[in-house]
């Protein structure tokens, strides 16, 4: 199994000035990763298009493919028509950098006035947005996908329902095995639901504290149900990563596995440990 790393995993080094986005591909290669994901930053559209062309050249010269482009979105808050138009531009950027996949978000579940919207009311709008974007992206050779993250669209049954509603061959699931815990689900059980629809996968691990337990130090955040999680090196937390990978493989998944690290350890040290652990886990698969 080919293992990639998300540029998001280097956030710590980017924030403290050790790295910038153009350092991601060389550093990923140095650490032994086979590919990279590029997460959209705060660049303007014009700047991002220039950067995409630079990253494509860098990727080709290094022999480290850009396997996916990740962007935010909110069809409810930002409006369907405007968000579809913007995301079509993002699909063009994905094609410019040579990324065959693009993940974009759905919604945080609030309208432009900050009022909560139910999943049932939001679903038709979100599904229509994904359908229009993926139809456009298909013409560029870019497959689009939704990731289970962001609380509102994080639990397995909601994501499955969305994919079934969109019902397009160019659209599928970026299965993040750790993120199910943010919706208080058991990762192994949720991956069983997700695996048949997987077009991409994230390896992510978390430390866990139940609601009411003492939570020491920094780095912890609340799940939807009030439990606490902290990002972990793969194999150090409570996510059964080997079993999740077995389930994906049994369902016929043969795609990339990408590391998304968000712990408090030094990110370079952690990413070195992540790939060592994943090579060991996947060696017999």
Where are the regions that the model predicts?
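Conserved, mostly hydrophobic/aromatic
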Residues: 5, 28, 36, 59, ...
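Active-site mouth loops of central-metabolism enzymes
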Residues: 6-20, 72-84, 116-122, 233-235
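Active-site beta-loop-alpha junctions enriched in small/polar residues
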Residues: 8-10, 39-41, 71-74, 107-109, ...
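Short, acidic/polar
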Residues: 15-28, 80-92, 183-191, 241-244
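Catalytic domains of carbohydrate-active enzymes, especially glycoside hydrolases
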Residues: 21-41, 98
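Active-site acidic/histidine proton-transfer and metal-coordination neighborhood
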Residues: 26, 54, 58-65, 77-173, ...
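Acidic/histidine-rich catalytic cores of soluble enzymes
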Residues: 35-36, 69, 128-238
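C-terminal helical cap(s) of enzyme catalytic domains, especially alpha/beta-barrels
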Residues: 268-285
């Amino acid at each position: 199994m080919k293992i990639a790393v998300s540029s998001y995993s280097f956030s710590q080094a980017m924030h403290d000035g050790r790295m910038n986005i153009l350092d991601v591909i060389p550093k990923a290669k140095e650490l032994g990763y086979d590919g990279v994901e590029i997460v959209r930053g705060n660049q303007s559209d014009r700047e991002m298009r220039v950067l995409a062309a630079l990253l494509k050249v860098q990727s080709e010269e290094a022999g480290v493919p850009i396997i996916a482009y990740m962007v935010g979105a909110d069809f409810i808050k930002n409006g369907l028509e405007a968000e579809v138009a913007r995301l079509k531009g993002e699909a063009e950027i994905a094609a410019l950098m040579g990324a065959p996949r693009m993940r974009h978000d759905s919604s945080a579940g609030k309208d432009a006035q900050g009022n909560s919207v139910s999943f049932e009311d939001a679903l038709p709008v979100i599904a229509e947005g994904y359908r229009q974007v993926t139809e456009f992206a298909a013409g560029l050779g870019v497959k689009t996908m939704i990731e289970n993250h962001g609380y509102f669209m994080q639990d397995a049954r909601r994501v499955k329902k969305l994919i079934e509603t969109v019902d397009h061959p160019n659209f599928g699931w970026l299965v993040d095995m750790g993120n199910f815990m943010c919706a208080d689900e058991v990762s192994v059980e949720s991956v069983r639901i997700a695996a048949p629809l997987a077009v991409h996968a994230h390896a992510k691990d978390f430390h866990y504290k139940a609601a009411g337990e003492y939570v020491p130090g920094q780095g912890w955040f609340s799940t939807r149900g009030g439990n606490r999680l902290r990002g972990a090196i793969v194999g150090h937390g409570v996510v059964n990563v080997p079993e999740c990978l077995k389930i994906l493989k049994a369902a016929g998944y043969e795609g990339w596995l990408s590391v998304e690290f968000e712990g408090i350890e030094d990110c370079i040290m952690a990413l070195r440990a992540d790939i060592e652990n994943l090579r060991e886990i996947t060696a017999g698969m």
